[in-house]
Amino acid sequence: MKKKFLVLIMISMAGFTQAQDIGSIFTDRPSQTDAVALLPKNVFQIESGYFWSNDEVLGNATTSMNIPNLMLKYGLLPWLELRAGTALLYRKQENISILTTNTELGGIFIAPKLKILEPKGLIPRISATAYLTLPGTGTGFAKDNNGALNTRLLLENPLSDNLSLAYSIGTDSDFSGNTNGFYSIMLSASFGRLGAFTEFFSNVINGGPNAVGLDGGVGFTLTDNFTIDLAIGLGLNTYATDIFLNSGIGYRIH
């Protein structure tokens, strides 16, 4: 009887240790490249932040803000992560004689992420995701009557214990016949609880010039389940947003 009791205790302790040993939190923000890794099964995560951008074209200036943006994530299966989110959007448009400001609720999106392959040698870790903006969601200028679908193939090669190269490629479609491409390349490093990245990305416009940008940022893991981040980006040509700032948090529950 005592032996059975000890065996049960050991099994319970092993299960508890395994359930808790999931490493430190990682997020899909603030970079343009989503994390290739998925949340462990039965783990819930909240990611939220502030995004500001400014762009000036031919004397017309547009300032946009997410106040805030929000993504909810859940590890449903070892190979499937469920995600959904939205944002409160502010926009200020200004030219020589007219100033307009609007605050609206952005469209609601769902974005499952699928694990495809674990890294082995030169073979990268691979996953895929698709952001589906639900038709008719959002208000005012942010309302999307047709919906949209943004697809991403996500890849990552570990270069060392604290350095990795991630890259993504995909398409952006608004369901009205317009489809553009996207790609990004990101180098990231970790130094204990501090992480940093730099990233090159481009929107490949169908029938038009590409928008090219560069950004970089840092993140700090305050605890294994809570992190903060800050990033800044610049447009490298006139077709990209001039400058943007991104800051936020991630909180994990398990």
Which residues does each PLM region occupy?
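Generic secondary-structure transition motif, activating predominantly at the C-termini of alpha-helices
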Residues: M13-A14, R29
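Transmembrane beta-barrel domains of Gram-negative outer membranes and organellar outer membranes
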Residues: Q20-H254
